[in-house]
Amino acid sequence: MASHTKDALLSRRYIEGQIAAGKHIIIFDDRVLKVDSWIKFHPGGDKSIKHMVGQDATDEINALHSVEARQRMLAFQIGRIQGPWVNFLPPIQGGKFRHYDENADSEEDDTSGQSQPPSPIFDAVDAAPGVRRQYASSETSVSTPASESSEPKPFFLDARTREEIVLDTAKYPSLDAKTQQDIKRRYRELNKRIEAEGLYDCNYFSYFIEACRYTLFAGLSYFFLRLGWYSVSAVFLGCFWHQLVFSAHDAGHIAITHNYQVDSIIGILIADFLGGLSLGWWKRSHNVHHIVTNEPEHDPDIEHMPFFAISHRFFMNLRSTYYDRVMYFDAFSNFMLKYQHYLYYPILLFGRFNLYRLSWEYLILGQGPRKGPAWWHRWFEIAGQIFFWIWFGYGVLYCSIPTWGSRLSFLFISHMVTAPVHVQITLSHFAMSTADLGVQESFPQKMLRTTMDVDCPTWLDFFHGGLQFQAIHHLYPRIPRHNLRRTQKLVLEFCRDTGIPYALFTFTDGNKEVIGRLGDIAKQVRILEECRKSCAQQGVFSNHH
């Protein structure tokens, strides 16, 4: 294994050793890619790559990248594999790997590498075949992002985790290799059918209609601003921002022109120049979300401590691999989570202000790529942020509105009107599964298990902006949103053929599901609080160190 060509067959044991040495190895279409030299150039950030180390990332790569980008990836090929690949748990998620010894017996090493990947949670023996199991060995840990809390937790938390896994494994197709391979095959066949039917082709007339709608809202906002009807003007400005987000989302997924740089420019003009939000921040976060959807330790889209928690696992002081910090379940979060089902909508009214903070943190700290094709995006975005605060902060708020009371009213009304988009974003995932079924679960099954769609009439599609088809979007992110309704019929066939449940709720029922989930977690917080009080009174943890 010391020297090999790009087409040389590499053993599982050798690949494991490379990962143990800190290399970033991923599998793509039976090719072994070593992407260490590319990771700092990756436009989507380094985290999304780190979550794919040691895994067959074929479906994730195909879903999120253009044909041209996939072709460029082949430059990092160092070999091939033969036969189906059994995924490792990535180092960033707590995976452990053994260093490679060229003098060791290769056959023995390969077979020993077939054991189940380790789990940072627990050994779910009773859940179902194929669920992650821990195995002990003399492995070297590359990265172990475990909880920093040593405080013991009540047993009901682990019992709840097991219960959720049991429920999901009973509801969804088996996690055995044959079943999951069949799901992958059908998913890839469906992609070919989608391509053949032209559903990846953008309908530019639909975007002309969108542009007319944006212009109408912006024009009405300006009209009423000049009349001095500041509150009405603020409402239409909020509608303008609400609708703009959907096209920025499309551009971020390269779903408009399918050209990376062109769509990036479109997205930055919309998000930064017109909306004051960083497209780069959103892409970095969103790409990770698309790969580790609804995983409490890894998905930034559900990491809203101390205000919201959609899983009891947030009670365990989880360490976020995205933010590289511990999400503490402290006294403040304990209080907030007990009432989160009541505070959900009020807090979302102020959601846009938090996006400003995250955007500036991303740009000031330079968290995006500084090299490669996206090196200049940061500076273009900063220019966009300056432009936004000149036209909105100075031109609208300061120069066009005479009193501070009216200015504050305009500011809050315009921002609160955008709250529905925060509801639409959280609606797709907050009520769905957060159970960890292991690294052998196929990409399409995981996306459908963790994502909800909204059933709405066609005439209301403009209001949801494609977010009503989030499950379908997660399967095929680069499909232009105006084609998602047609794609839905094909995905329904796929779900019937594979036996994967398709979660579809009306907007009202979906909101009820979300509030119900938040209320359930709030109830668990109260139970945990009672457990702690009881244990403290009985001195159960008095000898714990």
From Swiss-Prot:
Belongs to the fatty acid desaturase type 1 family. It comes from Emericella nidulans (strain FGSC A4 / ATCC 38163 / CBS 112.46 / NRRL 194 / M139) (Aspergillus nidulans). Disruption phenotype: Leads to increased resistance to cell-wall-damaging agents, such as calcofluor white (CFW) and Congo red (CR). Accumulates C8-saturated and unmethylated glucosylceramides. Displays growth and conidiation defects as well as and raft mislocalization. The gene is sdeA. Residues 1-82 form the Cytochrome b5 heme-binding domain. Keywords: Heme, Iron, Lipid metabolism, Membrane, Metal-binding, Oxidoreductase, Sphingolipid metabolism, Transmembrane, Transmembrane helix. This is Delta 8-(E)-sphingolipid desaturase. It is found in: Membrane. One of its GO terms (biological process) is sphingolipid metabolic process. Delta(8)-fatty-acid desaturase which introduces a double bond at the 8-position in the long-chain base (LCB) of ceramides. Required for the formation of the di-unsaturated sphingoid base (E,E)-sphinga-4,8-dienine during glucosylceramide (GluCer) biosynthesis. Plays an important role in conidiation. A motif (Histidine box-3) lies at residues 470-474. One of its GO terms (cellular component) is membrane.
